[in-house]
């Protein structure tokens, strides 16, 4: 999630893969951090965002780890690292995160104040 507190404008992307090279169909720019983050910034600016955005990351779980061979690819972890790399390159501060583990999460993004509420059966509720 990106949020500009000055204008109270934000957006989020559901990152599915760390790079376009891992997809058979790379037409959906919102699936990859290298294209989703610039797209979010562009859309926020179109809607009047003028301040410096900040970021919060949620997700990156390895929900099916028990089905993977030991040492197998952890796509969630790779998505988180790729997202952090793109944020660093764009000089967008990462101010909070709730990532990893083996549990799913529900995310509620309150654009009015930038709060992100993360809920999971395993970990309960957390506000970022």
Regions found by a protein language model. Give the residues of each.
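Residues at alpha-helix termini
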Residues: 47-48, 90
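Short, well-ordered secondary-structure micro-motifs
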Residues: 23, 66-68, 107
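Conserved mixed alpha/beta catalytic, RNA-binding, or beta-rich assembly cores of soluble enzyme
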Residues: 1-47
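Short glycine-rich phosphate-binding loop at a beta-alpha junction
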Residues: 52-59
